[in-house]
Amino acid sequence: MNIKSLMALILQLVCLPAIANNSQETVEKEYQIYWGICSNTSLMQSYPQKARKACNKAIEVDPNNPDISNPYLLKSLITIMFTDELKKGQSKTIFESTYKDLTKVIDNSDSVGQKSQASSYRLFTELIFKKKYKKYLGSNLCSDLERGLNHKMGRDLTQILMATYKNLKKECA
């Protein structure tokens, strides 16, 4: 091995960990910036598409972030609560994307509260929009009902849905 190759190897061994560490810091900073925009409640109400786009960017920037369920959940809530895209039936793709995002939260979150909230909103989308989009992925009604009632974060919406759709409880009994 010649001296230039040896020097290059030493330089790589010394510098690469610093470069990798710096890039991870950059990723974390970018994630926090996009997460801040995504979770801004006044922006959600005034410019829901912009807030949802920021949620997508947070997911894109750092898909392995331990808190990745947060942008998926907020992205879904923004679509359901602050846009009329699902009501107008503008796009089956938006419904499917929202449903899949809520499913990711349910499947991947460690938080019982987040699972409960995501389940109640998935139940909501399935019940409210089933005529427009049919059933999307089999029947998650009963498991969503159970999870929705399991924690205070999803309980209120789930109870409202049970009162509105009286057969729901019978269907899952």
What are these regions (language model features)?
Residues 42-56, 90-103, 137-140:
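Helix-turn-helix repeat elements of alpha-solenoid scaffolds
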Residues 26, 44-47, 64-66, 94, ...:
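Short coil/turn linker motifs that delimit alpha-helical repeat modules in TPR/alpha-solenoid proteins
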Residues 41, 55, 61-62, 102, ...:
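Alpha-helical junction/boundary sensor with strong preference for TPR arrays
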Residues 25-40, 65-86, 112-132, 163-166:
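Amphipathic alpha-helical repeat scaffolds of TPR domains
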Residues 1-23:
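Classical Sec-dependent N-terminal signal peptides that target proteins to the secretory pathway
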Residues 61-68, 105-118, 150-162:
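Short solvent-exposed coil/turn linkers within tandem alpha-helical repeat scaffolds
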Residues 136-173:
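Terminal, low-structured helical/coil segments at or just beyond the last alpha-helical repeat
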